[in-house]
């Protein structure tokens, strides 16, 4: 089995391995900047680590590839019999990360 980790960022958890591209909630920083993510669980072959003391020694490093926006979400508010319609759209800012190491 390959080495992978479950990391938490932006209130969500992601399964990552070295070389993966991951789309996460926006993280401040320029493209090319190194970012360290906090692991929640690490699997190395058949060895599973969830102990907080051991996870404090583990670092999941990644690099910011680009900043982009997610898909368009359309909001439509409507009130009956009054002719009230309100349309609005939203695109969530996201950051694409490339995982460079699990140590």
Swiss-Prot record:
Record's keyword terms, sorted: Ribonucleoprotein, Ribosomal protein, RNA-binding, rRNA-binding
HAMAP family: Ribosomal_bL21
One of the record's GO molecular function terms: rRNA binding
Organism listed in the record: Rhodococcus erythropolis (strain PR4 / NBRC 100887)
Protein name per Swiss-Prot or TrEMBL: Large ribosomal subunit protein bL21
GO terms of biological process kind: translation
Subunit structure, as described in the record: Part of the 50S ribosomal subunit. Contacts protein L20.
InterPro entries assigned: bL21-like, bL21-like_sf, Ribosomal_bL21, Ribosomal_bL21_CS
Annotated family: Belongs to the bacterial ribosomal protein bL21 family.
Pfam families: Ribosomal_L21p (PF00829)
Domain of life from the UniProt record: Bacteria
Task performed by this protein: This protein binds to 23S rRNA in the presence of protein L20.
Gene Ontology annotations for the cellular component aspect, listed alphabetically: cytoplasm; ribonucleoprotein complex; ribosome
């Amino acid at each position: 089995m390959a080495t992978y980790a479950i990391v938490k960022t932006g209130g969500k958890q992601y399964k990552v391995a070295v070389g993966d591209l991951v789309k996460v909630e926006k993280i401040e920083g320029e493209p090319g900047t190194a970012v360290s993510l906090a692991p929640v669980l690490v699997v190395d072959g058949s060895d599973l680590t969830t102990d907080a003391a051991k996870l404090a020694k583990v670092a999941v490093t990644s690099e910011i590839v680009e900043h982009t926006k997610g898909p368009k979400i359309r909001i439509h508010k409507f009130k009956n019999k009054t002719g009230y319609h309100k349309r609005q759209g939203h695109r969530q800012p996201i950051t694409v990360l490339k995982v460079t190491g699990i140590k």
